[in-house]
């Protein structure tokens, strides 16, 4: 800018009653006053993914102790910070009407960019007990504000070791799995989902041939390996720990159709017993 005398300007004056006159006007330039900050300028925080326009700038400009009214705005309010944390941005101060002797002013201020929140959903399908360790089939989805990939990790304890693999479970029951979802410039999202292993439905299919040496009693010792069960379409054996037996006896059919204990030697006897499931991993159908 140039301040002081910058030259002259000739001005021709024409009227109806007088001769034309030529005036010489001396031109003097004076720079506008640039106001300065009175104290600090502040900006309200924004969230990653938002533009600077969301943030409000607060400050005061002065000139020789006198407040200069005007407005603060971002030099480029459409700017979107590329990361969370402290971000340096330029502001522009425009003097208000009535303060034309003042020039616009610019400067930088640190604006806090907070991590954005993730939108996540985790669901697990239920399973039936198989006797083996199982991993639940899950659907985990995560959405970040800038399409950054979301990484999921899992643990069977809230403060446990989180890994990319879903914990395995064996016995029937309901289990809580903890997850963390993370993406750059976003707050980690945590939560839980339930893994359910349902008891395996079974029905008695057959009993193996059983024999004993005559001892004068119809009582029989029965073990789980003598029984075959049907589960869905598969034939299975249950471990001894899954069943308990009571009142197991050889019986014979009477003339009236009833069955009575039969301790005598002979073949073709019926077997009568009561069995009780002692494992929560199975359930009788029907």
Language-model regions, residue ranges each:
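Short loop/turn motifs that initiate or flank beta-strands
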Residues: 1-286
């Amino acid at each position: 800018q140039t301040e002081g005398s910058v030259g002259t300007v000739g001005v021709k004056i024409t009227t109806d009653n007088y001769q034309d006159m030529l005036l010489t006007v001396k031109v003097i330039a004076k720079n506008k006053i640039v106001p300065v900050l009175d104290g600090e300028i502040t900006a309200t925080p924004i969230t990653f993914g938002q533009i600077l326009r969301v943030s409000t700038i607060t400050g005061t400009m002065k000139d020789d102790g006198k407040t200069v009214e005007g407005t603060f705005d971002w030099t480029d309010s459409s700017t979107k910070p590329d990361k969370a944390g402290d971000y340096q941005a330029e502001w522009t101060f425009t003097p208000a009407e009535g303060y034309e002797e003042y020039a616009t002013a610019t400067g930088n201020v640190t604006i806090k960019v907070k991590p954005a929140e993730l939108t996540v959903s985790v669901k697990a399908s239920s399973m039936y007990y198989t006797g083996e360790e199982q991993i639940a089939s899950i659907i985990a989805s995560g959405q970040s504000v800038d399409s950054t990939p979301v990484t999921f990790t899992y643990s069977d304890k809230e403060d446990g070791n989180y890994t990319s693999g879903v914990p395995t479970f064996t016995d029937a029951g309901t289990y809580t799995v903890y997850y963390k979802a993370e993406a750059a410039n976003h707050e980690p999202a945590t939560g839980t989902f339930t893994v359910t292993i349902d008891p395996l439905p079974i029905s008695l299919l057959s009993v193996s041939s059983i024999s004993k040496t005559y001892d004068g009693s119809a009582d029989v010792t029965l073990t789980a390996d003598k029984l075959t069960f049907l589960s869905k379409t598969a034939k299975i054996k249950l471990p001894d720990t899954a069943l308990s037996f009571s009142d197991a006896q050889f019986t014979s059919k009477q003339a009236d159709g009833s069955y009575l204990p039969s301790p005598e030697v002979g073949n073709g006897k019926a077997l009568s017993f009561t069995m009780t499931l002692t494992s929560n991993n199975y359930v009788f159908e029907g």
